[in-house]
């Protein structure tokens, strides 16, 4: 778009790249006059200020000159650093003089601005250029083949590059080589260019166009390649730009023909060698890629010619153009908006006229009434592709899954004599792993879960633990997978049964000894202690005690039996008497109250037991209310089983004792709640140390959610290893809970889901996509987790189970593959598209859908197997991506015959109207009058209607060698061959024998014999008459071609109808084309003869080369199932290319490739290819599916270079053609 504008008819020169700010010098042109016809000349310097939105450029200085200029350049000689203007302005005058100006003095306003000047040339100096390696060297060219090399340090005596070229002519262009400093080129209007070597002082190469119509108006060296240059032609009869390589000067390397009239000036960008500016008499300014000839940008200009065009050295996106209308314009190739330009025009009009009548009446103008117009496009588009200076030389970006995507723009290597091929840009995808320890621990956890080695895993963690708390946690987790877990928990809390028993025994022995010491001073009475036998002295205290009880019981029994003693029942008024009276009357409650009143607690408890459970409970309460000791609360809880009170009221320092009591006495239904209650107290009321112990309570309770919450509070969860610590404990605890409690294994709380999502993100960032998907919660509707699951599934190439794909911001409509248009004259009925996507789910597929792997129609559809393990034990599986199927119907022939269930491959649009090879079958060649309807292939599938069986779709297709073309030569083949059955002789049935709905198009081919008159007298046909094979192409197929061998079993007996059209209702038409159902029977064609093709011109007499060979029935084997994808992928790719190709030559190549790939399919049927070739072909298919055709070509080259030529020579060349065309067409 246009940035600035100067109203001058002048030559131009940009300040060097080192100069800042940017200046533009203009000198009055010697070739034109301005609108005022002034003969004055001047030299001006303007400053480029892009921050100023106006179109005007600021004029810094003006120098009135006595010369007009043919060429003006600004050299970097004697440049100084900083913002001071420096360098030297070099001008070529009209009188043969070369003048050096000091731009700093011009801006300063000095009068003596000329550094030096010489008039050695005869005639105007039209060509000037500065050597970019030695900036003190300047080349100039003028009339009579004069070329001088000036040294700015010694400007007095110039040198010549050699003898003048003959014949003498004007020098219109001159340019120094951009790579070699001693090479100079000059060109003349006659079309000849001369390359000079200053070291030899002679011309080394002369380049000229053979048609002698080149009038050179521009010359430029390639910025990167030393041997290439371009020449522009001013001749309207040959408005071209020729690109030459000096190593091959016989003809141009490339010719750019974008202009319609002569080219006046060219300029090659030093910042990007793919940008070449050109302006011509067609009033166009074009920016082209000289390496490919493509026009990248056309500047919006007016209808005026431009005679000079230049790039800005400092800002490569800016250029200037001087036109014959007296304006010098500054443009940008990066696009922009033109609203400011239109506003400037409006402002200029307003400032000129104001709001008054311009005709002197002094009256204000009425408002201008204009019809409403649509606003023009105000945005100017930039280049088609970014220039090199804004392209990143390298780039890197992290993608999902921890992959680092990098690229680099390598400099292309120029090869002599070879057209520059499109540069291949490579993108490198690397897996970046930053947390190796994290991944190693995650792998160990997954292995433990998969092998269910939880005990050994926990024991390993216990051994590796350095902190006591970490060791306790893993010890508690380990107990969950062992028997008698509560006893093991007690042991971990310090309560071992064996140790406690030993302590009690020791305490009893100590008490016994104390009692024995007291008996030495006081003899026991007979009533207090029974006599001990001497033999009992060695017994233990317990045995002694039990023995005494037995003896007492025995003695009492003997006493009752031998002699009954009497006792007194006192009913006095004291406490004993009252108790006696209460007992005699059965009033246990009063008796207990009396005992409690008299502080006889043991008697009260014993009587309460006799009085029943209710009385015992009340007595226990009264007892506990009166008796206060250190263990009373504990005894109370033991007796009343009120452990919630203990958990809520115990001292938190005794949390271990409280947890031990819960482990010993709590019922299974209250155990988890009591552990949670104790954990909540520790977490909310305790200090930092006690808060960490709450995790042990939650582990005992199996409360994963609270364990996550507590751990998140007491631990640093910001590092990956800290999160790994938590996930290890969570996963192990969840597995323990699933084993010991009847809980939903998929139930996940919000906090746990968040942690699992973070963990899955970390795993995915390290490249463990499968593991991340395993740890991700399965049954949550949180948007972040749903999105992450979708991304993980897509990264693995599948869709989440029970979830539809998340829709993109825009809908991408897939183009149906393998779909041919209907034949002229046909009206296709309602058909399903050739490509439909089905996904296994609850809904049955449409009729005719063949489930993958379903051989028995009654068998249920197979589903993809789930992974061997899953952190959530999710039920169901994730189905794979929906597969592509061709909607088809499979039919059975004959009553009671079962249908053949074979998935039909997608029907490719015929490229040459060749029939596909029919499937092998032994069904009769005729259609029975009544056909059974096949059973549904899927439960709930509707039965197909009988009307779907039509004569066009019921007969098998002819063999692939029988190619019939109806129409003029060159017309594309149609799909009629897929719908029409064969006649008795292997040809199409006559038009009169077909139903009216099937008579399509002209029936005579390009080389068919004239049609016989129906009224002609019929001749008797002999019985052994052999009808000839119709000619179907200009040249017969060779005998060795497997495609030319037709399957021809013996002819049907006379009287057997080979074609019985089914009666159709009025207005009904048989569906034709490649979407009609096809029968699986073979084509019945009588034997015939073949005419082999011989070498020679088409149509030449063949002579005695005709042979009558009997044909045999040849049945091709099916392609193995694992290699069928090769055929479908290659055919689908060819069809996409055919749809995108526009030129006939490309289509012919693709048609030929489609035929010759049959050699590959035959080798696949015979399984004669080596495994390396087959594996390489499958890799090519993968690259085609990802549209990475460059990778496919690399694989192709590897296969060809490493395999036997005889194996691949039949099909690999055409496969390369297909890949190249696909890459070129971008399908």
From Swiss-Prot:
Record family assignment: Belongs to the WD repeat SEC31 family.
PANTHER family, per database record: PROTEIN TRANSPORT PROTEIN SEC31A, SEC31-RELATED PROTEIN
Compositional bias ranges of the Low complexity kind: 905-924, 1040-1049
Composition-biased stretches (Pro residues): 925-945
Gene3D superfamilies: 1.25.40.1030, Functional domain of the splicing factor Prp18, YVTN repeat-like/Quinoprotein amine dehydrogenase
GO terms of molecular function: structural molecule activity
Chain spans, region Disordered: 804-875, 905-1008, 1040-1075
Source species of the chain: Gallus gallus
Skewed-composition ranges (Polar residues): 995-1006, 1057-1069
GO CC annotation terms, alphabetical: COPII vesicle coat; COPII-coated ER to Golgi transport vesicle; endoplasmic reticulum exit site; endoplasmic reticulum membrane
Major place of residence: cytoplasm
Function, as annotated: Component of the coat protein complex II (COPII) which promotes the formation of transport vesicles from the endoplasmic reticulum (ER). The coat has two main functions, the physical deformation of the endoplasmic reticulum membrane into vesicles and the selection of cargo molecules.
Protein name: Protein transport protein Sec31A
Keywords, comma-separated and alphabetical: Cytoplasm, Cytoplasmic vesicle, Endoplasmic reticulum, ER-Golgi transport, Membrane, Protein transport, Repeat, Transport, WD repeat
SMART domains referenced in this protein's UniProt entry, alphabetically: WD40 (SM00320)
Gene responsible for this protein: SEC31A
Keyword Ribosomal protein: no
């Amino acid at each position: 778009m246009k940035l600035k504008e100067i109203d001058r008819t002048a030559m131009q020169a940009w300040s060097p790249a080192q100069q800042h700010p940017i200046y533009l010098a203009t000198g009055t042109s010697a070739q034109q006059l301005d609108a005022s016809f002034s003969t004055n000349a001047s030299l001006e310097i303007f400053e480029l200020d892009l921050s100023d939105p106006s179109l005007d450029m600021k004029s810094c200085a003006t120098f009135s000159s006595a010369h007009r200029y043919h060429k003006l350049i600004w050299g970097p000689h004697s440049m100084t650093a900083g913002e001071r203007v420096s360098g030297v302005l070099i001008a070529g005058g009209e009188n043969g003089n070369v003048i050096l100006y000091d731009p700093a003095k011009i801006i300063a306003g000095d009068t003596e601005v000329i550094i030096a000047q010489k008039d050695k040339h005869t005639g105007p100096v039209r060509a000037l250029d500065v050597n970019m390696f030695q900036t003190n060297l300047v080349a100039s060219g003028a009339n009579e083949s004069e070329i001088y090399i000036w040294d700015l340090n010694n400007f007095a005596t110039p040198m010549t590059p050699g003898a003048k070229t003959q014949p003498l002519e004007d020098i219109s262009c001159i340019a120094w080589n951009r790579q070699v400093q001693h090479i100079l080129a000059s060109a003349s209007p006659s079309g000849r260019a001369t390359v000079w070597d200053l070291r030899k002082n002679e011309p080394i190469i002369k380049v000229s166009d053979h048609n002698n119509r080149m009038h050179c108006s521009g010359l430029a060296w390639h910025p990167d390649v030393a041997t290439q240059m371009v020449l522009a032609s001013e001749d309207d009869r040959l408005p071209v730009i020729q690109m030459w390589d000096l190593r091959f000067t016989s003809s141009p390397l490339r010719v750019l023909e974008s202009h319609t009239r002569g080219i006046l000036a060219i300029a090659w960008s030093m910042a990007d060698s793919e940008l070449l500016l050109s302006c011509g008499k067609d009033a166009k300014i074009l920016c082209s890629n000289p390496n490919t000839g493509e026009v990248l940008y056309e500047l919006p200009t007016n209808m005026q010619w431009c005679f000079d065009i230049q790039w800005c050295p400092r800002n490569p996106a800016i250029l200037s153009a001087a036109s014959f209308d007296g304006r010098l314009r500054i443009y940008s190739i990066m696009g922009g908006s033109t609203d400011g330009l239109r506003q400037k025009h409006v402002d200029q009009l307003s400032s000129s006229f104001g709001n008054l009548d311009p005709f002197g009446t002094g009256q204000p103008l009425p408002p201008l009434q204009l019809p409403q117009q649509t606003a023009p496009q105000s945005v100017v588009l930039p280049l088609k592709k970014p220039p090199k200076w804004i392209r990143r030389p390298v780039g890197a970006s992290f993608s999902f899954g921890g992959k680092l995507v990098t690229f680099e723009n390598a400099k292309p290597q120029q090869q002599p004599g070879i057209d520059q091929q499109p540069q291949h840009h490579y993108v490198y995808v690397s897996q970046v792993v930053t947390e190796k320890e994290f991944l190693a621990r995650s792998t160990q956890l997954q292995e433990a879960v998969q092998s269910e080695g939880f005990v050994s895993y926990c024991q390993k963690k216990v051994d590796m633990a350095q902190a006591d708390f970490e060791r306790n946690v893993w010890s508690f987790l380990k107990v969950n997978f062992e028997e008698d877990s509560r006893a093991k928990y007690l042991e971990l809390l310090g309560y071992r049964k064996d140790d406690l028993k030993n302590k009690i025994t020791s305490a009893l022995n100590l008490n016994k000894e104390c009692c024995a010491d007291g008996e030495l001073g006081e003899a026991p009475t007979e009533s207090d202690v029974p006599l001990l036998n001497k033999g009992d002295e060695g017994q233990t205290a317990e045995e002694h005690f039990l023995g005494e009880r037995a003896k007492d019981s025995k003695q009492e029994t003997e006493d009752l039996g031998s002699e009954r003693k009497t006792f007194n029942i006192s009913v006095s008024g004291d406490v004993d008497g009252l108790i006696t009276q209460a007992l005699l009357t059965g009033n246990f409650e009063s008796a207990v109250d009396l005992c409690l009143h008299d502080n006889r607690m043991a008697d009260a408890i014993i009587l309460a037991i006799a009085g029943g459970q209710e009385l015992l409970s009340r007595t226990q309460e009264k007892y506990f209310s009166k008796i206060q000791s250190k263990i009373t609360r504990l005894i109370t809880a033991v007796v009343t089983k009120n452990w919630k009170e203990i958990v809520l009221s115990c001292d938190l320092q005794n949390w271990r004792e409280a947890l031990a009591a819960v482990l010993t006495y709590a019922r299974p239904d209250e155990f988890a709640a009591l552990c949670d209650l104790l954990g909540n107290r520790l977490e909310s009321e305790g200090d930092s140390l006690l808060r960490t112990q709450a995790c042990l309570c939650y582990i005992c309770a199996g409360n994963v959610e609270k364990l996550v919450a507590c751990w998140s509070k007491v631990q640093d969860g910001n590092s990956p290893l800290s999160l790994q610590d938590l996930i290890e404990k969570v996963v192990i605890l969840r597995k323990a809970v699933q084993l010991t409690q009847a809980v939903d294994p998929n139930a996940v709380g919000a906090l746990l889901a968040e942690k699992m999502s973070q963990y899955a993100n970390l795993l995915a960032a390290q490249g463990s996509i499968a593991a991340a998907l395993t740890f991700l919660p399965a049954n949550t509707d949180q948007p972040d987790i749903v999105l992450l699951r979708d991304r993980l599934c897509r990264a693995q190439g599948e869709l989440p189970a029970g979830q539809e794909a998340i829709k993109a911001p825009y809908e991408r409509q897939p183009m149906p593959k393998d779909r041919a248009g209907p034949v002229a004259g046909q009206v296709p009925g309602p058909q399903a598209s050739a490509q439909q996507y089905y996904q296994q789910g609850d809904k049955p597929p449409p009729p005719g859908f063949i489930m993958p792997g379903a051989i028995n129609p009654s068998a249920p559809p197979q589903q993809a197997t789930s992974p061997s393990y899953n952190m959530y034990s999710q039920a169901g599986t994730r189905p794979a991506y929906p597969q592509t199927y061709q909607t088809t119907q499979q039919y059975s022939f004959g009553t009671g015959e079962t249908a053949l269930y074979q998935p039909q491959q997608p029907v490719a649009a015929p490229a040459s109207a060749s029939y596909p090879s029919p499937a092998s079958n032994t069904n009769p060649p005729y259609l029975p009058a009544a056909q059974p309807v096949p059973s549904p292939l899927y439960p709930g599938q509707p039965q197909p209607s009988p009307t779907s069986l039509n004569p066009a779709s019921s007969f098998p297709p002819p063999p692939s060698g029988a190619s019939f073309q109806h129409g003029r030569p060159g017309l594309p083949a149609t799909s009629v061959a897929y719908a029409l059955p064969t006649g008795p002789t292997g040809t199409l049935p006559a038009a009169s024998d077909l139903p009216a709905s099937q008579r399509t198009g002209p029936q005579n081919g390009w080389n068919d014999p004239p049609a016989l008159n129906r009224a002609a007298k019929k001749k008797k046909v002999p019985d052994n008459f052999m009808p000839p094979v119709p000619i179907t192409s200009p040249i017969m197929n060779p005998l060795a071609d497997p495609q030319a061998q037709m399957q021809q079993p013996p002819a049907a007996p006379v009287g057997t109808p080979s074609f019985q059209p089914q009666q159709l209702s009025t207005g009904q038409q048989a569906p034709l084309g490649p979407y009609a159902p096809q029968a699986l029977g073979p084509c019945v064609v009588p034997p015939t003869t073949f005419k082999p093709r011989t070498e020679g011109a088409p149509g030449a007499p063949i002579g005695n080369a005709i042979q009558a060979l009997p044909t045999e029935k040849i049945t091709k084997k099916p392609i193995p199932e694992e290699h069928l994808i090769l055929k479908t992928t290659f055919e689908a790719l060819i069809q996409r290319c055919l749809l995108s190709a526009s030129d006939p030559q490309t289509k012919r190549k693709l048609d030929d490739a489609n035929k010759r790939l049959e050699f590959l399919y035959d080798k696949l049927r015979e399984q004669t290819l080596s495994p390396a070739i087959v594996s390489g072909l499958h890799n090519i298919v993968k690259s085609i599916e990802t549209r990475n055709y460059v990778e496919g070509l690399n694989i192709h080259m590897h296969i060809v270079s490493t395999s036997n030529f005889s194996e691949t020579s039949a099909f690999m060349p055409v496969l390369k053609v297909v890949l190249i065309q696909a890459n070129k067409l971008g399908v």
